[in-house]
């Protein structure tokens, strides 16, 4: 039986295990999908050693960047350009050796799920957070003709701090994407520290989180007329893309 899996920490919120095992069952595929909740990325190599029938892996928080050093190759169109990996294809070589190739399907899921929501006035975007997922969002927005800027609690050059989100900035940047875990179950009372009172119906708020269905970030945006969307469609689209990668 072929095996697929997910590495990350924590994985209590994971969608992938149920999605792929249901897919295997309904399509009669002799495979299983397992969650590997690891507290340190160094445990990744032990997973590979102990599971020789692994054909593919997904990668989630906080290992999308840390896993790269364990890979043999990066897909130049996605993972290498973005600098983050959420899909690993495991290719069997002669003499029992394996080749690990890293891809990024987050960019596919994000761009395809937000593209139809963008209007002519959506020219600039704020990306809340600077982790692995934020990099795919950054490149996805660029590909759609939207100018992105990162917002961080500890901003680097060219980035904004939350204290710099003035009325002028908020009026200019009408797309806001949350890539932080703030508001994810079970800590549903949390949300990014942006000036929600400055939001208008011109704003589009996109939260990469999908549990709960409506985060506090989204709810506070709706209170001021903003259009909101969660990350479930992105998750589905990136999962479809991952399956295509593993079987290409």
Predicted regions located by residue number:
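Short glycine-rich anion-binding loops that position phosphate/pyrophosphate groups of nucleotides
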Residues: 59-66, 133, 181-184, 211
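Residues in the short beta-alpha loop(s) of Rossmann-like NAD(P)-binding domains
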Residues: 10, 154, 211
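Active-site capping/gating segments
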Residues: 112-113, 227-248
């Amino acid at each position: 039986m072929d095996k697929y899996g997910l590495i990350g920490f924590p994985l209590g919120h994971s969608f992938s295990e149920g999605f792929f095992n249901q897919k295997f069952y309904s399509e009669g595929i002799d495979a299983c999908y397992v969650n590997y909740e690891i507290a340190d990325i160094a445990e990744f190599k032990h997973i590979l050693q102990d599971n020789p029938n692994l054909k593919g892996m997904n990668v989630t928080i906080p290992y999308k960047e840390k896993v790269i050093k364990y890979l043999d190759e990066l897909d130049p169109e996605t993972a290498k350009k973005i600098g983050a990996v959420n899909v690993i294809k495991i290719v069997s070589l002669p003499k029992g050796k394996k080749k690990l190739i890293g891809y990024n399907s987050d960019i596919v899921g994000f761009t395809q799920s937000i593209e139809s929501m963008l209007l002519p006035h959506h020219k600039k975007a704020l990306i809340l957070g600077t982790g692995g997922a934020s990099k795919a969002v950054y490149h996805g927005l660029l590909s759609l003709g939207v100018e992105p800027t990162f917002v961080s609690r500890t901003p680097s050059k060219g980035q904004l701090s939350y204290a710099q989100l003035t009325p002028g900035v908020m009026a200019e940047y009408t797309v806001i994407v949350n890539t932080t875990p703030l508001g994810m179950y079970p800590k549903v009372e949390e949300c990014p520290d942006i000036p929600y009172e400055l939001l208008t119906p011109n704003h589009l708020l996109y939260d990469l989180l999908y549990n709960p269905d409506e985060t506090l970030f989204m709810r506070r945006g709706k209170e001021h007329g903003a259009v909101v969307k969660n990350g479930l469609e992105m998750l589905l689209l990136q999962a479809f893309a991952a399956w295509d990668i593993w079987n290409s």
